[in-house]
Amino acid sequence: MGELDNAVAVITGAARGQGRSHAVALAEQGADIIAVDICADIDTIPYPLATKSDLDTTAERVQAAGRKVVPVVADVRDLAGLEAGVQAGIDALGEIDIVIANAGVVAIGDTQTRAEPLFTTIVDTNLTGAWHTLLATVPSIIRKGRGGSVVLVSSSQGLIGRGGDGSAAMFAYAASKHGVVGLMRSAANAYAPHKIRVNTVNPSGVATPMILNDFVINGMTENPNPAVAQTLLPDVALVESQDVTEAVLWLVSPRARYVTGITVPVDAGHVVM
C-alpha cells in the first residue's frame, strides 16, 4: 500500500529530469500518471529539450512501478492543446487528484540584454504555462469532489534576485519564477473552498539536463559571478532531482493535509546566502 494509492496525477515536463523523478516516485506510491511534455526543441531556447523517446522512457518506468500512465505530447504554452491532452488522460484514468506543474526553461549564459523573443519564451513557459496547467487540471479535481494537491515548481530564484546579470534570460527567469509564487498564493486562496491545497517547491540548481548541457555549463564557466552560486552548504554544487521529489511527495501526501500556500526551498541554503 502506498500513500497515493489509486490517485491520478498530472505532471508537466515529465519526460526527463525532475518531472521523470516525480512521476516514478508518485507511481511507486500508487498513483497513475498523466505525463505531459513538449517533446520538441524551442527555437529561442539554446539547448536540446526532451524527446518523445525520453517521454516513453518515463512511461516505461511508471509501468515498471506497477501503475498506469498516459503519455501526452503537449506544449504548456498552448492551452487548447494542453487541455486536449489532459482530457485524453482523464478519459483513460479518471478524474485528477494531484497536479505538478514542472515544465520550465532557462537560458543561463545568454547575455543578450534585449532578447525579447527569449524573454517571452521563458515567461510563457514558466509562468503562463503554470497558469495554463491550473486551467487544464483543476476543474477535474473539483468535479471529483474530494479535494487535491497542486505543486507548482518555482525556484530559489523565485524568492531572491541573485544571479541577475542584466540579461533578458535571467530577468525573465527570475520574474517568471517569482510570478509562479504569486500564482500559487492566489490559487491557494481561490481553490481552498474545494479542499485543494496549492504550494510551490523552490529548488536551486538541479542536476538535470536543463542545467547539465553544454550551453548552460559554458555560460556559467564564462561568467563566474558569485551571484550565480547555487548553494550555501559545502560540497553541494547542485541538488539532485530526488531531493526535490521528496519535498513534492510530502506536499501531495496526507502528511501535508493542512499545508497550503507555502514555498518550500530545496536549495542547500541558496536563499539565505
Give the residues covered by each predicted segment.
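The beta1-alpha1 cofactor-binding region of Rossmann-like NAD(H)/NADP(H)-dependent oxidoreductases
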Residues: 52-53, 73-85, 116, 241-243
